[in-house]
Regions:
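Long, structured stretches of catalytic cores involved in phosphate-ester chemistry, encompassing
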Residues: 21-351
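Bacterial Sec-dependent N-terminal signal peptides
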Residues: 1-23
Length: 351
């Protein structure tokens, strides 16, 4: 009886849900940009496709407030949706945030209520009470899935809590016809700004040192695109270079990004000398849409402008596992399929 009681206490306190390796998975669904005020039929399609996990990549609600009661009410609205309840019942949910659920459009480290917002986020996604996420600033975290001699690492970054102010656009590219729309931001030219902050960077280095065959890095902001004047890692080119240098330094093969934010889907391929290509699969539009896709020199698939979700499927049965990247739209049409072999994103094949 004492053992049963102790086990119950451990479950309630989250002790059984610490960052221990979990069973190997092969199907990862993901998406972002979901207004709690709208129907979300995409979520029922996610359930239909039977992924092992679903990763929320930010703008999971549209908070945009400094009133924590209002932010909680928006989480309550999402929780009450039948389609969200079906998703939660059938698929394991993991999440990071972006600006709107963090609290304010395009906000970074100066958002006043980031600690209070964090508590609401962790409560909504049922973070274990003893989770490391509750012990440090921000919500960055990682998971390891393993079995049959293979390992998959999922890293979820926090690109809000520590991010420096963006540099405002002041007409520097006004004569460039490539940018046919109003730009908001321009890349930082000095390296005194940050996306992740020193503590998160140090943590990430230790994570990338861990053995893994596939490493999926989730970021609310797009990583692999070229500059487009909107929010992205490209506004912090020194931080983008730091990420690539860190991947190379730690010899972390198998890295692939999943991102959100922009209200359309695409796949970007970022190629640099002496390093394998970094793929970035953007799935952004559970409910949100945009009028156009911005220029992206690194785009190899897309864009898909209709509501959608993303899927990564790993074929572990092969000696050289296949990685299939997909985008499925709200009518359950496969709009993008792009498959690579794991060896293609390995330092063994870098040039």
């Amino acid at each position: 009886m004492k053992k049963v009681y102790l086990l119950s206490l451990m479950i309630l306190s989250g002790c059984l849900l610490t960052a221990q390796p979990q069973q190997l998975i092969s199907k990862i669904a993901f998406g972002s940009c979901a207004s709690e005020a709208e129907r979300q039929p995409v979520l029922d399609l996610v359930v239909k496709h039977k992924p092992d996990i679903f990763v929320y990549l930010g703008d999971n609600i549209y908070g945009d407030t400094k009133d924590m009661k209002a932010l909680q009410a928006k989480y309550d609205s999402l929780a009450a949706k039948p389609e969200f309840q079906r998703l939660k019942k059938n698929v394991k949910l993991l999440a990071t945030w972006d600006d709107h659920d963090y609290g304010w459009n395009d906000s970074g480290k100066w958002y006043t209520f980031k600690k209070e917002s964090k508590e609401l986020f962790l409560k909504f996604f049922e973070e274990p009470l003893n989770s490391d996420r509750r012990k440090h600033d921000g919500i960055y975290t990682s998971y390891m899935f393993e079995g049959n001699g293979r390992k998959l690492q999922l890293v979820l970054l926090d690109n809000r809590t520590f991010r420096s102010d963006l540099r405002l656009y002041r007409g520097e590219l006004s004569r460039n016809e490539k940018y046919f729309y109003p730009l908001d931001y321009y890349p930082h030219e000095i390296e005194d700004s940050t996306m992740l902050g020193d503590t998160q960077w140090k943590w990430l280095e230790e994570e990338l040192k861990k053995p893994a065959d596939v490493r999926i890095i989730g970021s609310g902001s797009q990583f692999g695109i070229s500059f487009n004047g909107y929010e992205a890692w490209a506004n912090f080119p020194h931080e983008q270079k730091r990420m690539l240098a860190l991947i190379k330094k730690t010899k972390a093969s198998g890295v692939l990004f999943i991102t959100g934010d922009v209200h359309y889907a695409e796949i970007s391929k970022l190629e640099t000398k002496g390093q394998y290509p970094i793929y970035d699969v953007t799935a952004s539009g559970i409910t949100s849409t945009w009028l156009f896709a911005t220029p992206n020199d690194n785009r190899i698939e897309g864009p898909v402008m209709e509501n959608h979700f993303g899927m990564l499927t790993i074929d572990w049965s092969k000696k050289d596992p296949g990685l299939k990247m997909e985008i499925w739209d709200v009518k359950d049409n496969q709009r993008i399929e792009h498959t690579i072999s794991l060896s293609e994103i390995s330092f063994m094949n870098s040039k």
